[in-house]
A protein has these predicted regions:
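Positively charged n-region of N-terminal signal peptides that target proteins for export
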Residues: 1-4, 19-20
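C-terminal motif of bacterial Sec signal peptides marking the signal peptidase cleavage site
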Residues: 14-17
Length: 212
């Protein structure tokens, strides 16, 4: 009997550790927070069960995870901007179409990946504090209205390896980098800074979905 109680207690602790604060709503089974920005932000990464979970890693323009993240297995790697358009990867606004947007493909409804401008808005209009959430390093990001989300430092995947988890965060946008056939926009952070950049499309990075 004591063993049963212990199991139940541990299960309750696990549920509490994954319970987010300040949730504003739910769409297609996934909760979001209104930070007072142009879009609403999911409380967790794509593929994660709670805010501090890393979630899944995606190459840019792919909607499923995989074992190896390299140039050969990434269909968008090496494609010019015009080629991305002609093959249907990006639409008229220059961002990934629904078919190739990992957030839309996996969560459905109106969920999608953030654009480069929306990521930069999150970066520049919010207050970022390096912290831990249930022993997971990352940033507490507070919006103009006082609401917040947690972004774990989930690292990234190259080939079969997970690198720099716990110290770096790497998040994709849906926007390709026009000056390179190999890169797309995302943002990167460590314990001291956060900035926008362009990164190899074949690398496995995390995604924080958004809603209009």
């Amino acid at each position: 009997m004591r063993k049963i109680y212990l199991i139940m207690a541990l299960a309750c602790m696990a549920l509490v550790s994954c319970k987010p604060d300040g949730v504003d709503g739910k769409h297609h089974g996934h909760e979001y927070v209104d930070l007072g920005l142009s879009v609403k932000w999911a409380i967790s990464n794509l593929g994660a069960s709670c805010p501090e979970d890393y979630g899944h890693y995606f190459a840019w323009g792919e909607t499923t995870t995989k074992e190896i993240y390299d140039e050969e297995s990434c269909p968008t790697y090496g494609l010019s901007y015009s080629k991305l358009q002609s093959e249907g990867y990006i639409g008229d606004k220059g961002n990934l179409t629904e078919e190739f947007d990992a957030a839309t493909a996996n969560w459905g409804g109106d969920w999608r990946m953030p654009t480069d401008k929306e990521l930069d808005e999150l970066r520049t209009k919010c207050t970022w504090t390096w912290t831990t959430n249930n022993d997971v390093y990352g940033y507490n990001v507070v919006g103009p209205n006082g609401n917040s989300i947690f972004l774990p430092a989930a690292g990234s995947r190259s080939w079969s390896s997970l690198m720099f988890d716990g110290s770096l965060g790497n998040y994709w946008s849906s926007t390709p980098y026009m000056l390179s056939n190999d890169n797309a926009y995302g943002f990167y952070f460590n314990s001291g800074s956060c900035y926008m950049g362009s990164y190899d499309r074949n690398s496995g990075r995390t995604i924080r979905p958004v809603l209009e």
